[in-house]
Structures are given as C-alpha cells and as structure tokens.
C-alpha cells in the first residue's frame, strides 16, 4: 500500500476529508439561498452584475473556507500525535517529509474541491439570475482561481504550525487569532501587511471588483512555497512540543 493511500485513509478516518467537503456544500447552499433572498437588493447595488455576484457573496464563503482550513489542519496530525506515534515514524522505513507533502497535497485538493462546489453554485446563479448577457464565465473562473491561490498561504502556514505542536489548541488558537487580526488589517493598503497570510486570503473579500490583483496572487504563491519549504525541512527533525 502506497504512502499516499495510507494518508488518504488516515485523513478520512480523522474527519479531514468530510470537513472540507462539507464546507464546499455548505458554501454552495449559502450562495444559492442568499442570492435567492437578496436578489433585488444585490442587483440594485451600484456595481456591475459580475462584481455583485462575486464580491458580495464571497465574504461569507471565504470565512467558511478559512475556518474549514483551520479545523482541517488542526485535525490532520491527530493520528500521528496519539501515543507519540509521530516520533516512532522516524524509526520506520517511512519518509516523514514525504508524508508532510502528501498531507499538503490532500488538503490542497480538498480545498480546490470545496471552492469548485461553491463556484458551481455561483455559475448556476449567474446563468439564471443575472441580467441577460451579463454573466461572464471566464471572469468567474479567474476569480475562483484567484480566491484559491490567495487561500493557499493560510493552508500552508497552518499545516506547518500543526505539524510542530501536539496540542491541538495551539494551531487552533493561532488560526483564530490569524482570522481576527486579518479581519482588522485587511482593509489597510500597506505592503508590510502582505506578510500576514490571513490578510492575503481576505484581500479578494474586501475588494469591490472581481478583477484579480496579480501582485497579491504573486505574494500568495511566494508565501505558500515558503511555508511549505519550511515545513518540509522541519519534518526531517523530531523536535515536537
């Protein structure tokens, strides 16, 4: 049995897979119900219909995704930390850094699935509820890709934190603190705040346009790779809480 298959079974048993799939389904349901209830109010806003569709619904979807990431990353090392099992892995013919990469890959794919489910709901809304001729599928795809990319630094950062601490309350506390501080700082247009992964994730939600910001996307990709590289490097060492 391959290490990837083992990881998939562990994440399913730990509840990681159901959590992020549920986030996708819940987000899609929220978008459909919210637009159905507030359709006239939303379409009366002084914004282009595509900007209304993407920016006015994305805030809550982002919060769902963010807390889904926080919960999933807190749970993903649960089995390894039981009975100090993670320390025993170093005595087995198992590559712990490779295991870390597989966890990152699984979380990334699950987040992508969740965002895809949510955007399928937005496509349905755009095709049936926006004024005739105003729905632009390429614009939605670009924004979906942008929101996925800007979410990755938080995922990469929290996986790193979760891998280093056995106490689940530490990554959970850091995740909640990151969310609260990110909410407080996201509206400030200061370059130094881009070092804050939660601020990066929140940027699409505070923008009034559905057009992706290439500089923010570049920062997000850089931070994702940086946190992944640090986590991969630290996985070679057995120092845990």
Task: Put a short name on every predicted segment.
Residues 67-81, 156-169, 224-237:
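Transmembrane alpha-helical segments in integral membrane proteins
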Residues 24-69, 101-166, 206-211, 215-219:
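Secretory targeting signals
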Residues 33-53, 172-241:
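Terminal transmembrane helical anchor/hairpin motif
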Residues 77, 86-89, 121, 125, ...:
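Hydrophobic alpha-helical interface/terminus motif in multipass membrane transporters
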Residues 19-25, 165-183:
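Pore- or pathway-lining transmembrane helices of multi-pass membrane proteins that form conduits
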Residues 1-24:
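Aromatic- and glycine-rich beta-strand/loop motifs that create alpha-glucan
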Residues 76-108:
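Helix-loop-helix units of permease transmembrane domains in multi-pass membrane transporters
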Residues 1-9, 77-90, 144-169:
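Cytoplasmic juxtamembrane interface segments
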């Amino acid at each position: 049995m391959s290490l990837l298959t083992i990881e998939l079974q562990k994440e399913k048993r730990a509840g990681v897979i159901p959590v992020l799939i549920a986030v996708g389904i819940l987000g899609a349901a929220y978008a459909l119900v919210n637009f159905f209830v507030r359709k006239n109010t939303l379409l009366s806003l002084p914004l282009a219909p595509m900007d209304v569709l993407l920016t006015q619904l994305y805030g809550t979807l982002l919060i769902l995704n963010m807390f889904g990431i926080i919960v999933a990353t807190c749970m993903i090392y649960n089995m390894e930390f039981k009975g100090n099992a993670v320390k025993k892995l170093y005595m087995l013919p198992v590559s712990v850094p490779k295991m870390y990469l597989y966890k990152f890959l699984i979380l990334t794919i699950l987040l992508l699935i969740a965002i895809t489910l949510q955007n399928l709901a937005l496509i349905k809304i755009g095709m049936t509820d926006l004024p005739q001729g105003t729905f632009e599928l390429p614009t939605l795809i670009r924004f979906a890709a942008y929101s996925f990319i800007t979410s990755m630094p938080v995922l990469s950062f929290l996986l790193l934190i979760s891998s280093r601490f056995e106490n689940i309350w530490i990554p959970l506390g850091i995740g909640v603190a990151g969310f609260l501080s990110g909410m407080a700082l996201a509206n400030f247009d200061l370059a130094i705040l881009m070092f804050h992964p939660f601020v990066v994730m929140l940027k699409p939600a505070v923008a009034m346009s559905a057009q992706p910001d290439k500089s923010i996307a570049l920062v997000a990709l850089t931070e994702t790779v940086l946190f992944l590289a640090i986590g991969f490097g630290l996985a070679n060492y057995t120092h845990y809480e």
